[in-house]
């Protein structure tokens, strides 16, 4: 929110990480274009998030594969011999950690707030295996948060959190979690796992003497017998459209160096941004897991997800309140997960209708809604 507010001053600086809640139709008013997307796609990946009308306004700092940071030693001591591939198997693994070790099975990082928003990153590719879901399926689909009954889709993601909290498989008091402190805690075996992007792995490894104990597993959802992992950009470098030409040129050169020469993405355990660059060892557990990159929205609908998302006030990937509410309701027991998503679906449907979208059943991977 701070940087979005500062953008209104025009003289905020030369380079920033583009706010994720900036609407696509605002990009050209704030940032220069790096060039046309078709040309840039030849050398760089994960450009869809800040591409608009054929131009690219943000170059990713690194790419994230969405999974779970975990302590391998804790899982081993708990008797978890195979990484869980479904929500049921994951909750069972957390229960084993609780029963057989002194570690906190799943650390929510509730108090930090922004960390809770990480859960939104799993409802697309990880939960559906569908590159069209986030920019088409959820936009046009009917009741996208409903329980599919097969442990897939957005409901399955959020229900993992709900069940972990309600079954007391998290810290005793989520309001007292400590983001900086949790890094050392997972490093030394006091925490079993945390739901965070691959960007977090290196931080956990460097927080103590047990770097080799830190691993990264695919998110435990299986769609038609196969696991998927959402892959997307971390913060993207944007260059101020209001800066003078010399500063814009210098900024462009600096972003090029950061992307192509600095080794930043590899050092952070991220997906490389340059086509053909080497993947880091931390993603070894993703061998056989298909990475899913969201397709761009259909032409003419580039702003539609953002508009519905804002109108619904759910604010996926923009706010953490809806995810924190899951924890609060699970703790108090005053609402089931089904009741929570009923409210979300109603708000989403109302927002769809506000923007002249008639929701219809959507099948993952189909790319179309039912007639």
Protein language model features and the residues they cover:
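Extracytoplasmic/periplasmic substrate-recognition and gating elements
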Residues: 56, 77-78, 167, 206-272
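Conserved N-terminal structural module of periplasmic/extracytoplasmic solute-binding proteins
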Residues: 1-23, 39, 82, 223, ...
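Extracytoplasmic/periplasmic solute-binding protein
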Residues: 53, 57-61, 66, 91-143, ...
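Hinge/lid segment of periplasmic solute-binding proteins
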Residues: 18-67, 91, 118, 215-217
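Short, solvent-exposed loop/beta-turn-alpha elements that line the ligand-binding surface or hinge
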Residues: 33-43, 48, 126-156, 206-209, ...
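C-terminal capping/gating helix-and-loop segments adjacent to ligand/active sites or protein-protein/ligand interfaces
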Residues: 293-353
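A structural signal for short loop-to-beta-strand junctions that line the ligand-binding cleft
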Residues: 4-7, 13-14, 39-74, 104-108, ...
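Glycine-centered hinge/linker elements that transmit conformational signals in sensory
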Residues: 94-95, 138-174
